[in-house]
């Protein structure tokens, strides 16, 4: 009689919330960069450096950018964005659907509607 031992190892993804929080932290601390062109023996080379000298150079794990994101609060025909004006928001939410964030700090109007609809209920 023989015995058999099976050992299984695998990697698993962290919880989606953990990944989202990690990426949000990276986004919030992203470094703005500028592209510098300089001549080397093989021709022109482009490198990125921090836009402001008082910031340390980013590491390989830091998030960097060299163009500002568009302002999604305002309409932009080039990108097809309608902006956030007249959007429905959630007054009680502090998330992305909340009025403070969605209305870009412009304030919001509260409107109460009463509707009469057939509900097709069966009793």
From Swiss-Prot:
This protein's UniProt keywords: Developmental protein, Disulfide bond, Extracellular matrix, Glycoprotein, Lipoprotein, Secreted, Wnt signaling pathway
GO biological process, one term: neuron differentiation
Location(s) in or outside the cell: Secreted, Extracellular space, Extracellular matrix; Secreted
Superkingdom, taxonomy of origin: Eukaryota
Chief place of localization: secreted
Keyword Disulfide bond assigned: yes
Keyword rRNA-binding: no
SMART domains for the chain: WNT1
GO-annotated molecular function: cytokine activity; frizzled binding
Post-translational modification: Disulfide bonds have critical and distinct roles in secretion and activity. Loss of each conserved cysteine results in high molecular weight oxidized Wnt oligomers, which are formed through inter-Wnt disulfide bonding. Palmitoleoylation is required for efficient binding to frizzled receptors. Depalmitoleoylation leads to Wnt signaling pathway inhibition.
InterPro entries: Wnt, Wnt_C
Family of the protein in this entry: Belongs to the Wnt family.
Protein name in the entry: Protein Wnt-3a
Organism in which the protein naturally occurs: Meleagris gallopavo (Wild turkey)
